[in-house]
Amino acid sequence: MSYPERKRKRSRWSKPHSTQNPSPSLPDDVLLSIFARVSRLYYPTLSHVSESFRSLLASPELYKARSLSGNTEICLYVCLRCSTGYRWFSLSRKPDQTLTYEERKSSGYALARVPIPGGSPNVRSSSLVAVGSDIYNICGSINKASSSSSVSILDCQSHTWREAPSLPVELSSISASVRDGNQGGHGYSDSRKNSFKVFAYNSKEGRWDHLVGLGAGSFMLPDSYCVIDNVSYSVSDGMFRWYDTEVRRWKDLRGLFQLPKFSAGACVILADYGGKMAVLWDQLPYHHGFHKTIQCAVIALERRTSFVFREKSCQIWGKVEWVDDLLTVPTSYDLVKVLVATL
């Protein structure tokens, strides 16, 4: 007696069909239109999907589409110094994944490494300034006292460095800043105190113009200071203050109850983050260790006016929107600069 042939069941351990990395089947122009509507915080994650995604996310056409659709946004960049040079990172969203209870309390932000072909040139904190989608490195020599006239630009769209027109003269003790929406460089052309010079970059003409009548007192703000909506803020020994121009004195920034205490010797940097204050610092381990964390807090600012004995009194309150660990690095890494570009 013959039995009908049974279909052989696939073994539970049989090798599954090979699958390739998903390749986008949509035309590039459609993908660009979609990417232009996605927050740039997700771009580092999207760039890992495929090589074509990575190419589209770095294309000039994408940022033209973002500009035309009104989807430009601010992007926070962080520069760190290590033994082999300088490394750049950008604020991004963590990929969606199954999270533990502790991870659910996280802000969801992290610092993603910015791949820069050829690496980064030598930079200093005072030599860097962000204008639009570019970060300018003005006379960024390693030795602060050495003179230089070189200028290079980091294009935050393609993440590539390019050379820019040099300053007309070499400057030492250089400091870069933004004044009236224009990038500038200022410093001393020689050892004399009266040799302080200020230059502003004319992007249309591609040249540096010498500005007369501006003294050194108008500049030289360290990274523990920042200006937000024409108000100066500072931090020293963990105390945040703002300058009241009406009474000409510094006042304490109130609130900030959720802000943790900084470790002794921490480098704290402030930045204008779209009208809010971004605070980044390196948190050293409580016990001697080989790693430390780069932490960040974003603070919303609110001006409040009250009257005390018929006298007007202004105060500014800060509300911590989120605070989190963004990156773990060796203790030998130094926090150099925090910049905010518009893309």
From Swiss-Prot:
Residues 1-15 have a biased composition (Basic residues). The keyword Iron does not apply. Residues 20-66 form the F-box domain. Pfam families: F-box, Kelch_2, Kelch_FKB95. Keywords: Kelch repeat, Repeat. Kelch repeats lie at residues 134-181, 183-224, 225-271. It comes from the Eukaryota. Residues 1-25 are annotated as: Disordered. Gene3D superfamilies: Kelch-type beta propeller. InterPro entries: F-box-like_dom_sf, F-box/kelch-repeat_ARATH, F-box_dom, Kelch-typ_b-propeller, Kelch_2. This is F-box/kelch-repeat protein At3g08810.
